Amino acid sequence: PDGVELVYSVAGQGEPALVFIHGGLAERSFYDGQLAEFAPRHKVIALDLPGHGESGSDRTKWGIPEFGADVMAVVDAEKVGQLILFGNSLGGPVAVEAALLMPGRALGIVGIDTFQGVDYTISLEEVRERAEFFEKDYAGALKEMIGLLFHKDADPAIVADAEKRMSGTPPEAAKAMFLGMAGYDLGAAVRRLTVPLRAINGDLYPTDVEANRKLKPDFEAVIMEHIGHYPMIERPEEFNRLVAETVDALVR
């Protein structure tokens, strides 16, 4: 929307389109297994948010609403009518913002290890601390963060692969992204939603379903046992089955 280059992968045909949004510091290749799995039945899109993967980083506003507009720009470029939005981590709030920009087009939002508690505002102090941590020692901060996103006995090859893919995010983009989240009120955005909100979450951090239902009475979550922050790369077959079930339920 602001002229920044957006790079995305697209496969298949058929609506609703499935649109996959990665988390902070990640990139679209985290969803390669979903493009392959769902392309026979749906148009599947996975994009790199600005500052991530192959997308550009020439922008001044880095908020979650701006990322939501980026998602809509890609969806519009692909002439998609109806769609379901999937968002991992930061991609969850981004999916909410994208849905709010596209009334009547989104059939639902599915968080992927996100929305553990939707009544949440990100404080400036919290993001400033995180931004400074990454600015000082990006590689060290990334390693420490990834250590908190997997179970201790997770497959070391999968953990190393995630770290390698995330190490390509420029530190300046990481800092801008963290600072751009300050003051974002997820609860207020969720209250405005008129489409179903779902989550496929790991069990590393608890999901407060009852608290979420106070804001969004139709909220539902499926918890994958002994899975961390990236179920799509940790147990792709099980994850894909849950995605298919969720899509079927939202389309019915």
Where are these regions (language model features)?
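Conserved HGGG/HGGXW glycine-rich cap/lid loop of the alpha/beta-hydrolase fold
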Residues: 4-57
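Structural signature of beta-strand start/N-cap positions in the alpha/beta core
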Residues: 17, 41-43, 79-84, 105-108, ...
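Conserved catalytic-core motifs of eukaryotic protein kinase domains, centered on the activation segment
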Residues: 30-32, 55-61, 121-122, 210-211
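Active-site loop/oxyanion-hole signature of alpha/beta-hydrolase fold enzymes
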Residues: 36, 46-90, 241
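Conserved hydrolase catalytic core segment
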Residues: 80-120
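Conserved alpha/beta-hydrolase catalytic His-Asp/Glu region
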Residues: 119-125, 133-192
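Conserved loop-alpha-helix segment in the C-terminal half of the alpha/beta-hydrolase fold
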Residues: 196-233
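Post-His helix in hydrolase/transferase enzymes
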Residues: 233-248
